[in-house]
C-alpha cells in the first residue's frame, strides 16, 4: 500500500486502514512523480561530483588546440606539467636542536 492512498480512521475496535481506490488518476500521477523524484535524487547523490564538475567547467577538457602547431602544443603541455610539479628548492629545511 502506498502512503498516499492510506487513511487511518478510528473505529470501535481500534485504528483501521481504509484505502481509497488506487486507480484514481491523481494518485497514479503522484506515485509516478514520487518514484521519479526518488530515482533522480539517488542518481544525483551517486554522481554529484561528475555532474556538477561538468556544469561548472563545461564539456571541454581544456583549451582548443585546433590549428596550433605540434611544437606549440608540446610546449604548452610542458608548461602545464611544470606548473603542477612541486619544486623542492622553495622549501627550507629547519632542524630543531
UniProtKB/Swiss-Prot annotation:
Gene Ontology biological-process annotations: protein complex oligomerization; symbiont genome entry into host cell via pore formation in plasma membrane; symbiont-mediated suppression of host autophagy
Principal localisation: virion
Topology of this chain in the membrane: Single-pass type III membrane protein
Gene3D superfamilies membership: 6.10.250.1640
One Pfam family from the record: Flu_M2
Transmembrane segments: 23-43
Keywords, in A-Z order: Disulfide bond, Host cell membrane, Host membrane, Host-virus interaction, Hydrogen ion transport, Inhibition of host autophagy by virus, Ion channel, Ion transport, Lipoprotein, Membrane, Palmitate, Phosphoprotein, Signal-anchor, Transmembrane, Transmembrane helix, Transport, Viral ion channel, Virion
Lipidation (S-palmitoyl cysteine): 50
InterPro entries registered for this protein in UniProt: Flu_M2 (IPR002089)
Site (Seems to be involved in pH gating) location in chain: 41
Regulation: The M2 protein from most influenza A strains is inhibited by amantadine and rimantadine, resulting in viral uncoating incapacity. Emergence of amantadine-resistant variants is usually rapid.
Subcellular location field: Virion membrane; Host apical cell membrane
Residues recorded with modification Phosphoserine: 64, 82
Residue intervals on the Virion surface side: 1-22
Site features described as Essential for channel activity, possibly by being protonated during channel activation, and by forming the channel gate and the selective filter, chain residue numbers: 37
GO cellular component, one term: virion membrane
Intravirion side stretches: 44-97
Region Disordered, annotated ranges: 60-83
Any one GO molecular-function label of the UniProt entry: monoatomic ion channel activity
Family: Belongs to the influenza viruses matrix protein M2 family.
Comment field (misc): When the channel is activated, one or more imidazole moieties of His-37 probably become bi-protonated.
Description of how the protein assembles with itself and partners: Homotetramer; composed of two disulfide-linked dimers held together by non-covalent interactions. May interact with matrix protein 1.
Role played: Forms a proton-selective ion channel that is necessary for the efficient release of the viral genome during virus entry. After attaching to the cell surface, the virion enters the cell by endocytosis. Acidification of the endosome triggers M2 ion channel activity.
UniProt comment concerning the protein's domains: Cytoplasmic tail plays an important role in virion assembly and morphogenesis.
Protein name per UniProt: Matrix protein 2
Source species of the chain: Influenza A virus (strain A/Chicken/Victoria/1/1985 H7N7)
Gene designation: M
Amino acid at each position: 500500500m502506498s502512503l498516499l492512498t492510506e487513511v487511518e480512521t478510528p473505529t470501535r475496535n481500534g485504528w483501521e486502514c481504509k484505502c481509497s481506490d488506487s486507480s484514481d488518476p491523481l494518485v497514479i500521477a503522484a506515485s509516478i512523480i514520487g518514484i521519479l523524484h526518488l530515482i533522480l535524487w539517488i542518481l544525483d547523490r551517486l554522481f554529484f561530483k561528475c555532474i556538477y564538475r561538468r556544469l561548472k567547467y563545461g564539456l571541454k577538457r581544456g583549451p582548443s588546440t585546433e590549428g596550433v602547431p605540434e611544437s606549440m602544443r608540446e610546449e604548452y603541455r610542458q608548461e602545464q606539467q611544470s606548473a603542477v610539479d612541486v619544486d623542492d628548492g622553495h622549501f627550507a629545511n629547519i632542524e630543531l636542536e
